[in-house]
Amino acid sequence: MFYRVGKFKHELGKTDEIMGFFKSNEDTFKASEGLKGVFYFKASEEEVVGVAMWESKEHFEQSADRIQSVLSGLAELISGPPEIYEGNSGYNFNKD
């Protein structure tokens, strides 16, 4: 698995609007081959963190333009470019 994590800083009170933005783009996520899942959480009053799980880095790269077009629509809601971290899974624990 390949993971991509984005940390988005925003003005106080924008969290719900940002979450709504991502929810409104679910069709784009569904159309992204190899995307296993994505979730976002409120990390602080002024930060949202998103985690995307892909089958492989190649799958992410094939959909990068589509995903970037979604993120460009987020520009007016965030305070600057997101911090991005990415890499392949090194350790996994599943209780299932």
Please provide the spans of the model-predicted regions:
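Glycine-rich beta-strand-turn "strand-cap" elements at beta-sheet edges
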Residues: F2-Y3, K7-K9, L35-V49, S72-D96
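Generic alpha-helical hydrophobic packing signal
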Residues: Y3-V5, E17, E26
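Short, surface-exposed ligand-recognition loops at beta-strand->loop->(often short) alpha-helix junctions
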Residues: K9-M19
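Short coil/turn motifs at secondary-structure junctions
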Residues: E11-G13, A43, E55-K57
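Intrinsically disordered, low-complexity acidic/polar segments
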Residues: T15-E17, E47, H59-E61, F93
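An amphipathic, aromatic/His-enriched active-site/gating alpha helix that lines ligand/cofactor pockets
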Residues: S24-K36, M53-Y85
